[in-house]
Amino acid sequence: MEDFVRQCFNPMIVELAEKAMKEYGEDPKIETNKFAAICTHLEVCFMYSDFHFIDERGESIIVESGDPNALLKHRFEIIEGRDRTMAWTVVNSICNTTGVEKPKFLPDLYDYKENRFIEIGVTRREVHIYYLEKANKIKSEKTHIHIFSFTGEEMATKADYTLDEESRARIKTRLFTIRQEMASRGLWDSFRQSERGEETVEERFEITGTMRRLADQSLPPNFSSLENFRAYVDGFEPNGCIEGKLSQMSKEVNAKIEPFLKTTPRPLRLPDGPPCSQRSKFLLMDALKLSIEDPSHEGEGIPLYDAIKCMKTFFGWKEPNIIKPHERGINPNYLLAWKQVLAELQDIENEEKIPKTKNMKKTSQLKWALGENMAPEKVDFEDCKDVSDLKQYDSDEPETRSLASWIQSEFNKACELTDSSWIELDEIGEDIAPIEHIASIRRNYFTAEVSHCRATEYIMKGVDINTALLNASCAAMDDFQLIPMISKCRTKEGRRKTNLYGFIIKGRSHLRNDTDVVNFVSMEFSLTDPRLEPHKWEKYCVLEIGDMLLRTAIGQVSRPMFLYVRTNGTSKIKMKWGMEMRRCLLQSLQQIESMIEAESSVKEKDMTKEFFENKSETWPIGESPKGVEEGSIGKVCRTLLAKSVFNSLYASPQLEGFSAESRKLLLIVQALRDNLEPGTFDLGGLYEAIEECLINDPWVLLNASWFNSFLTHALK
């Protein structure tokens, strides 16, 4: 039956049916008759609505293949097949705009011509029996019922069949075809008998032969046969006392459930050690841009041309010198690498025609910085499998680091507004269905709140840098290619602007596997003096390369300009995710949407406008040592976005582990706040699992300290 369903129905319908069954915890592979019934019902709903439109005069017309540009509105809104939240949003929206009474159960369609909801039924039994069951269930005069059967009969409220003869004939023919196809495969009888009122029955299949022997062997201890295990499972009352249940299951388990009280949880222990250091792939709050407005030079849009143009806007270059060496590196090599970049950029300008890409000379300083010839030689396993003491290198445990204040400052900065817009508002066509309309209104409000946010700049910077690096890694595998770090934005006045943050030089990049590493050296401009927080810049060698005149309230001041240089590495899979950082916008938009949905369901109307336009209302943003921080809806949007962006910029196994394990503790604490009297066993084990992820990662340590603030305030 399952194969038949997948062959017989459109893949979109099959996918919707699977989703619907999963939502109710049912398995399409087991309850195959139900699977077929849901697909059939979905298809009938779609056929009911197909080709029916309302024209400019408000008349109902049928268009099978006409002028696609005609201003037509679909006559029916399809509610069936959407997930529950979205379906109710559509229903609420229709009720608000048309004044129709809100149904108690989710209907299948809404008819804009007759202004009524429609409940569609497809039955394998007598139509009038099924009609009465439906009518009894929904108990509403307002919802119109229309029942079809597989034998070509139909029945509708007050014998009003809504559609024309021909449209209904199409549906009946399709149902008849499905029945014949099932019959020819010997599936029809089981399908016909499985309908029981509004429910279907599951068949219980017998297990025989090898499978039966395997089942008997794999029973839990103390069960003699599959039958008595089944009987035990069927009689298992899930909401009894947990200790009793555990001891029933196995003699070995003696879990003592401890009540979880306000005094139970302790704060997470954050590690000691030197302060943690910056580990992002590019500078964040400390980055400095050399920019050109309204770029119109020859070759505009070609990164190398843009970079040279940006470099020419700055006149304060001076002889570079090292002001913060890298602890373990050969610092003169970093200095030589920057001098080489300047020299080779100068060479380009002296050429007749500027090339589109620039491959650096393979000098000793670049070979050193890019780890050329440093990888240990690979030996075939066949050649060394007889070595008696073959073992993996002992690797040192990572040194623990303590939380430093810079990471909170980085996060605060990411939530702030810049004076440029980093994403364009999508130009969206006219919406036809109410749900599209709500979605695009929400998207526009959200975009307005975050388009100028610094986190959005990081997204676009990350997308551009990763795209350029992945392209170069594939196109110029053996070359040390010079890759400008560029982003684009618009000023307040709407003028285009191109920004240069610095340069990357990539090493050899024969990336066969997703996790193969390409080394690169990054050189980034900054006005931040590294001596103020030297621990943050442990992995960098910092040069002073110029003086920049800045306009301030007291007139022009000259500031030293620095270059932050470090060796770094990334992989195909990391670059692929970096290129997809725009997903962070979607993730935070969905979080905001769920807040709006919650408000809307309380008020029983769509609250989008009020949500974004009521400037006086404040919303909880997060926990700090001072208590629950609150802010405007725009601040909430930007904070959620910044969290999502930092999860991407600082992605790591430590973060994965911390998020998964701390969530368990969070749920227990929330249960306590909701007076659900939670109980736990092995709480110490959970703390251990959380704390083993707190090693040295700045973003994880910051999240752990936020978690501690949350614990303090949640348990007051």
Curated annotation (Swiss-Prot):
One of its GO terms (cellular component) is host cell nucleus. The keyword Manganese applies. Gene3D superfamilies: Influenza RNA-dependent RNA polymerase subunit PA, endonuclease domain. It comes from the Viruses. The keyword Plastid does not apply. Phosphorylated on serines and threonines by host kinases, including human casein kinase II. A motif (Nuclear localization signal 1 (NLS1)) lies at residues 124-139. Its main location: host cell. GO terms for biological process: cap snatching; DNA-templated transcription; symbiont-mediated suppression of host gene expression; symbiont-mediated suppression of host mRNA transcription via inhibition of RNA polymerase II activity; viral RNA genome replication; viral translational frameshifting. It is an enzyme of class 3 (hydrolase). InterPro entries: INFV_PA, PA/PA-X, PA/PA-X_sf. GO terms for molecular function: endonuclease activity; metal ion binding; RNA binding. Binds 2 manganese ions per subunit. Keywords: Cap snatching, Endonuclease, Eukaryotic host gene expression shutoff by virus, Eukaryotic host transcription shutoff by virus, Host cytoplasm, Host gene expression shutoff by virus, Host nucleus, Host-virus interaction, Hydrolase, Inhibition of host RNA polymerase II by virus, Manganese, Metal-binding, Nuclease, Phosphoprotein. Mn(2+) 2 binds at residues 80, 108. A motif (Nuclear localization signal 2 (NLS2)) lies at residues 184-247. Its cofactor is Mn(2+). It is found in: Host cytoplasm; Host nucleus. Mn(2+) 1 binds at residues 41, 108, 119-120. Its EC number is 3.1.-.-. Plays an essential role in viral RNA transcription and replication by forming the heterotrimeric polymerase complex together with PB1 and PB2 subunits. The complex transcribes viral mRNAs by using a unique mechanism called cap-snatching. It consists in the hijacking and cleavage of host capped pre-mRNAs. These short capped RNAs are then used as primers for viral mRNAs. The PB2 subunit is responsible for the binding of the 5' cap of cellular pre-mRNAs which are subsequently cleaved after 10-13 nucleotides by the PA subunit that carries the endonuclease activity. Belongs to the influenza viruses PA family. Influenza RNA polymerase is composed of three subunits: PB1, PB2 and PA. Interacts (via C-terminus) with PB1 (via N-terminus). This is Polymerase acidic protein. The lineage of its organism: Viruses, Riboviria, Orthornavirae, Negarnaviricota, Polyploviricotina.
